């Protein structure tokens, strides 16, 4: 909660007439900190008082696994976001949403069955099944939209129907990029393909209007000169679309991931204090800067 000028407190989330903010975190390349960014942002905003729904749209289900589930066992046949998206007898999204061990943070899990959505969508397009893939997630979210301030979607690392379904339900995008030549080349390819696909969809269904599109420099090592040069190159081209604060590369994040934890869950006594402080400042800095973008989408002034 925040404190007003007269000492009153108020929550930072939606107010009357504010739209639900649906944010897809995307990249074309695996290992670009998509899932790491998604779970840390979701947890940070839940801790800040936002009502958050995390949606795992990746059949690999890394985000679901990070919340302590074993998708290959617990969601082998049902109980995932696929159940709400499938073309034959879909269920309401509310039926598959799980509470997590974080207050204010719920999860719509994924599982391997979600990969079926790609082939089913191709079939549905041929046979003109309604609603089309362009609307399916948006319609599913609409059922529960009053329950949340933010939806954070972890997308798969390819530009298929699953990713496009997420992008078309979104109000804003966050693209993660590791500042290396290969990763930047991959991102450029992703953006070119996404642009062409979106243009085709707009010709068929009308304009797609996101509130914002931001880039997050991830797994950044400030002492790595080529990385610093590449980060500077990205900022020179993309300007203020690149978040000022990068997500640093840290052993604390990788160590936490080994036990399906985030840095917010680590036992401070198990980590070098300087290391933990450094990565907390980085992750919180990213989240707080991106929070300003969200607040601006609601038409609010930010610091």
Q: Which residues are covered by each model-predicted region?
A:
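P-loop NTP-binding core
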Residues: 1-303
């Amino acid at each position: 909660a925040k404190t007003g000028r007269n000492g009153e407190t108020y929550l930072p989330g939606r107010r009357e007439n504010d739209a639900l903010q649906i944010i897809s975190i995307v990249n074309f390349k695996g290992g670009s900190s998509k899932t790491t960014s998604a779970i840390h942002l979701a947890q940070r905003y839940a801790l800040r008082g936002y009502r958050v729904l995390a949606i795992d749209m990746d059949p690999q289900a890394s985000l679901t696994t990070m919340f302590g589930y074993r998708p290959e066992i617990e969601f082998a046949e049902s109980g995932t976001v696929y159940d709400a998206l499938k073309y034959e007898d879909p269920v309401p999204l509310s039926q598959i949403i799980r509470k997590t061990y974080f207050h204010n943070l719920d999860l719509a899990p994924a599982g391997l069955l979600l990969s079926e959505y790609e082939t089913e969508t191709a079939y549905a397009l041929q046979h003109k099944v309604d609603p089309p893939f362009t609307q399916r997630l948006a319609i599913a979210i609409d059922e529960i939209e009053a329950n949340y301030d933010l939806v954070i979607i972890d997308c798969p690392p390819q530009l298929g129907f699953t990713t496009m379904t997420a992008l078309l339900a979104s109000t804003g995008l966050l693209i993660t990029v590791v500042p290396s030549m290969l990763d930047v080349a991959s991102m450029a390819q992703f953006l070119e393909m996404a642009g062409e696909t979106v243009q085709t969809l707009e010709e068929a269904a009308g304009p797609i209007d996101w509130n914002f599109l931001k880039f997050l420099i991830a797994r950044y090592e400030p002492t790595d000169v080529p990385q610093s040069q590449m980060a500077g190159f990205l900022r020179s081209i993309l300007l203020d679309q690149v978040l000022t604060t990068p997500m640093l590369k840290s052993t604390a994040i990788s160590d936490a991931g080994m036990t399906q934890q985030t840095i917010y869950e680590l036992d401070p006594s198990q980590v070098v204090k300087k290391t933990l402080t450094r990565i907390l400042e980085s992750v919180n800095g990213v989240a707080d800067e991106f929070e300003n973008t969200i607040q601006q989408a609601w038409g609010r002034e930010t610091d």
